[in-house]
Regions:
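Divalent metal-cofactor coordination and adjacent catalytic microenvironments
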Residues: 2-202
Length: 202
């Protein structure tokens, strides 16, 4: 019998680790969720559940978003740290006829706080529901219609028919709207898509 090894969370600290699998630690997220009004799913989870959620959240962030610039190290495991990724919050900016110049890039030896915070936000969401799972139906609504037979026909049987239609507005984004807002300053969803899975409302 093969014994599975326990998950080991390895935080990316900005050095471009080859084996990093998370942008934040459970302790980082404890601090992020401190005072969060709806943090019960996180605060009530075990340490192992928290770390598993963080690793999965990091995978989703990296797979669903393409960040600007390029990886700081060719062999690093995650998308961050990055070179030449514009920083909209940089304080030293100079405008020239050639565009933005000066110290307006995210430092190539760090992970932006917003990326770590978005990872924490997604980890909490994943402890509530698997955002990668599309429920049965894949966005298809089936409406049943009952047809009562008129008394004049002399029969008492009823019949039922159903109509199936696709509800394009019935979707759930894989990356939550809150996390998307945090990450969008540094990049965009892959292929400009919505990053959503289809839902069926009960």
């Amino acid at each position: 019998m093969v014994e599975l090894m326990a998950l080991l969370l390895i935080k990316e600290d900005g050095s471009g680790k080859l084996d990093a699998n998370s942008y934040a630690t459970a302790a980082d997220c404890d601090g992020y969720h401190d005072g969060h009004l709806y943090a019960t799913a996180w605060t009530g989870a075990t340490q192992s559940k928290k770390e598993a959620a963080l690793v999965m959240a990091t995978r989703l962030v990296d797979s669903q978003f393409q960040f600007n610039g390029f990886r700081a190290h060719s062999e690093q495991a995650l998308q961050w740290p990055r070179e030449k990724c514009p920083d909209p919050d940089a304080s030293l900016l100079t405008i020239s006829v050639l565009g933005w110049v000066g110290d307006n890039f995210v430092e190539p030896d760090l992970v932006p706080a917003a990326v770590a915070q978005a990872t924490c936000e997604m980890a909490r969401e994943l402890l509530i529901v698997d955002r990668t799972a599309a429920p049965a139906g894949e966005g298809l609504d089936t409406v049943a219609t009952a047809h009562a037979t008129h008394a004049a026909t002399g029969t008492s049987s009823d019949s039922t028919s159903s109509t199936t239609k696709y509800n394009k507005s019935d979707t759930r984004p894989i990356i939550s709207r809150v996390a998307q807002a945090m990450l969008s300053k540094y990049g965009a969803l892959v292929d400009g898509g919505s990053g959503a899975v289809r839902l069926v409302r009960a």
